[in-house]
């Protein structure tokens, strides 16, 4: 193993992490926009109903 291998591997790993965080952030923003649109249309998230006697 050479120094260059470790350097390139670390740059590659950093690039993968950066891409993963970018995709995750993009997907989360998209999901939040979809939820906001549903709530604006009057559709709310389902909540579990309480059982009788509990």
Swiss-Prot record:
- Tell me the Pfam families matching this sequence: CcmD
Can you quote a single GO CC term? plasma membrane
Indicate how the chain sits in the lipid bilayer.
Single-pass membrane protein
A GO biological process of this protein is: cytochrome complex assembly
Keyword Cell membrane part of the UniProt annotation:
yes
The protein's UniProt keywords, in alphabetical order, are: Cell inner membrane, Cell membrane, Cytochrome c-type biogenesis, Membrane, Transmembrane, Transmembrane helix, Transport
Localization annotation: Cell inner membrane
- Where are the membrane-spanning stretches? 7-24
Recorded family membership: Belongs to the CcmD/CycX/HelD family.
- Role: Required for the export of heme to the periplasm for the biogenesis of c-type cytochromes.
Kindly provide the name given to this protein in its UniProt entry: Heme exporter protein D
Which organism is this entry from? Rhizobium leguminosarum bv. viciae
